[in-house]
Amino acid sequence: MNWKKEILEKLAFIKSHVKSASLGAKEQEVSYNPCLSEEDIATFEHKHCITLPEDYRSFISEIGNGGFGPGHGLLPLDKAIVDFKLRDKPNISLNEKFPYSDNWNEEWIASFDWEEEYPETEIVDAYISTAHIAGCLQISHFGHGCTFLLVVNGDEKGHVWFDGRADYSGLIPKMTDGHKMSFMEWYISYLDMEIENINKSLTDSIND
């Protein structure tokens, strides 16, 4: 089964069962935005001096430019470059390389006395600066300011990372079977998790 067929079949299953399974998503939310044209994608890549990871590029051109996904859903490409967590909503610099290859967090966080004080504004601003996520798209808002990142520039290109800086947990690559997850691995694993939750909910309702 090719990835496009697999995704659409899994989405159809989720959409057809989401109401009976009493899950949080509504039927109208289990959908995708219109696809981007090849011309639109090429223009974006040229503007930011990058090439998108092939699986993500195929997704937004053949499945949809954002929509159903982890957290609050997949963000469309033009929204994925904006760091919405910050007051001035700066764009993320995609033509710079993502600076990390392994879990990262500031050392001061582990030793900080959170019950007695709060870090100075300058320290927090440096911690949440977009410089830490240069070369990344924010592809999904997980909640409480935490996001999923797709690296599009640097040695980590094509890998999905979790940005937990909003709750001071740093930057962490998403892993599966001992290796870092690609966009497609990450997204299909999300669909599989939703299907597992639906099946469990349906089984529980039968047994009640």
Provide a role label for each language-model segment.
Residues 63, 77, 140-142, 151-153, ...:
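Structured loops at beta-to-helix junctions and adjacent beta-edge loops in soluble globular domains
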Residues 129-153:
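Extended serine/threonine-enriched, polar tracts that run as long, contiguous segments within proteins
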Residues 1-131, 135-138, 202-208:
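A surface-exposed partner-binding patch
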Residues 169-208:
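Long, compositionally biased interface segments
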Residues 66-70, 74, 155-157, 166-168, ...:
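Generic alpha-helical propensity signal that fires on short helical segments
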